[in-house]
Amino acid sequence: STICLWNCDQARKPTEAPKEEINELPHLAYSTLKGEPSTTRSLPGGSILILFNTDCDHCQREAQEIAEKSEAFKNYEILFIAADSVHHIENFAKAYDLANKPNVKFGRAEYQDVYKNFGSISTPAIYIYNRERKFVRSFLGETPVEELIKYL
């Protein structure tokens, strides 16, 4: 049987109040694109975590907008995580001109690890954390970049 954990969703669903379990950087294990193990807990303060699928139209548009407005995100580390193959993730990073941005990283996580930390989510799922590594706001689904910038 197949269980769908992530899906593309047009509707933007912001959550204003942080859930108690997402009040700081989660402990999501992932691998860098070079195969090195890491965890989202190692992210610095001032981070944006983006869970995405490489073939999701909404994720592609979100990445394009972030690349176009990358100057607004220069003081934040952005980590894109997908459960797709490393090859597909690398191609996504290159296609949207994010591969060589110093503050943008890409990683690969297992579906079950994402589900354990975030539950069933729509992609792109964007989580903003402040300098103290505390949760600020999440956005589920494609979101105008101007909305994200308001919370940086």
Residue positions per predicted region:
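Short active-site neighborhood of thiol/selenol oxidoreductases, capturing the structured segment around
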Residues: 39-60, 66
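A short helix-to-beta-strand connector/capping loop
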Residues: 23-26, 74-76, 100-104
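Thiol-/selenol-based redox modules, centered on thioredoxin-like
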Residues: 128-152
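Structural microenvironment flanking redox-active thiols in thiol-disulfide oxidoreductases
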Residues: 60-97, 111-116
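N-terminal "domain-start" segment that seeds a small globular fold
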Residues: 9-40
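C-terminal motif of bacterial Sec signal peptides marking the signal peptidase cleavage site
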Residues: 4-7
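Short, internal strand/loop/helix patches
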Residues: 96-127, 131
